[in-house]
Amino acid sequence: MVCTPVEKSPNLLPTTSKANSKAGLAPLLLTVVELIRQLMEAQVIRRMEQDCLSESELEQASESLQKLEEQVLNLCHIFEIEPADLNINLGDVGTLLPSPGSYYPGEIGNKPSVLELLDRLLNTGIVVDGEIDLGLAQLNLIHAKLRLVLTSRPL
């Protein structure tokens, strides 16, 4: 089988940049990065309130979080993605991220989000144990036995 690059063909329809911003990996990856950024921000707030961070650590963390947020917004601009579109509505489960200003770590929000659940799990700690078989065409190609410890505390 020979693979050749796709050439410009009259049969291919050009896509608009708006259509491209809804497809591909960029929106998904930016959503994951934003979720992780907000989780880290919640952990910094929790540690700050527990006086577990020095002034320099707090300053470094806040500067890093601010730069990461700027990069997410910059990449949204480059890929023509509305930052609000990073918050996925998961139906009955709620939204992936809380609406701006509606969640503060340690407090119960009006409309819980997946981020709030993950933040609480990190704060409490959880162990997930299981097996995964990955494959295709009815072939199990990868077998994994996993134990995941999810916590914000040192192990």
From Swiss-Prot:
One Pfam family recorded for the sequence: Gas_vesicle
Localisation per UniProt entry: Gas vesicle
Gene Ontology CC, one term: gas vesicle
Keywords: Gas vesicle
GO-annotated biological processes: gas vesicle organization
GO molecular function, one term: structural molecule activity
Family assignment from sequence similarity: Belongs to the gas vesicle GvpK family.
Record-linked PANTHER family: PROTEIN GVPK 1
Stated role: Might be involved in nucleating gas vesicle formation. Gas vesicles (GV) are hollow, gas filled proteinaceous nanostructures. During planktonic growth they allow positioning of the organism at a favorable depth for light or nutrient acquisition.
Protein name: Gas vesicle protein K
Species annotation: Nostoc sp. (strain PCC 7120 / SAG 25.82 / UTEX 2576)
